[in-house]
Amino acid sequence: MNTDKQHLTHSLPCDAHLPVNHCNLPALILGSLTFQQHPVPLNLDGVKEMHIELFRSLETINSSKQRAESFQDYMRSAFLLDHLEEAGFNPAGRRRRDKADYLRMLRGWLFNSDGKEGAAMKSWVESRFGLRTLNHHGLLRDYMSEHYLAYLIDCAKALYNTNALNAQLDLLYTYCQYEIRRQYPSQQHIRLYRGINHIREHEVIRQLTKHDYVLVLNNLNSFTSNRERADEFGDYIMQAQIPLTKLLYTPGLLPASLKGEDEYLVLGGIHQVQLSFF
């Protein structure tokens, strides 16, 4: 691919996006460098409309902690998480999947983003935003490779016999965006850090200076706001201005269920980053 042309158009490589998604913007736009620099809200098709009563009730609650509690109560009710037999779950089944909900996916990701829960969340990003999974236990450029087959197997294991898991993640993203807009109404970006071992772990579109790169991130990534924390995960520190609209999860979003985690879950696409030693 002609990198000069790609830089001028700020477009994703063809193998990094799907032609369709379930979002108000196509992947080619939301995954572009222009979007990183000038973000706009991302809305998943029909999610807020379907759950409009939740968001109306949240408008009446001033405390973010109480809003989180209300959100989790709603999730339990809407997806029958406390009454899964009503959703068709068979407790006598050979494989128990009664705890495979959105919280299980988050905890699994935070423990190991290359595990089966991580695969399920990357698959969800593919479906909803059209950003392809580029790395899972290794690069996934070859769809006939063992790595890609292992990724598909992990997805199948994570999604098997779950209760509308993708719909749960849809609502998690929509709630996260609601909280961000409510708490930071005039802010568009947040400075975040990620530890890496080498820049070539990512597809580099262009090197602008010794430390500045334009590259393609995996479709879902962990970042932190703590530079020292990022240093624990690699020899180099990647710094980026991340659009708030690309956040699926932020620290403290669900304080009663996920305590002490300092990770931000960030949607991928093209980003301009700065690379440095600690």
Can you describe what each PLM-predicted range is?
Residues 1-98:
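Intrinsically disordered, low-complexity, charge-biased terminal/linker regions in eukaryotic proteins
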Residues 62-63, 115, 243:
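Helix N-terminus capping/helix-initiation residues
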Residues 20, 40, 47, 125, ...:
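Extended aliphatic helical segments
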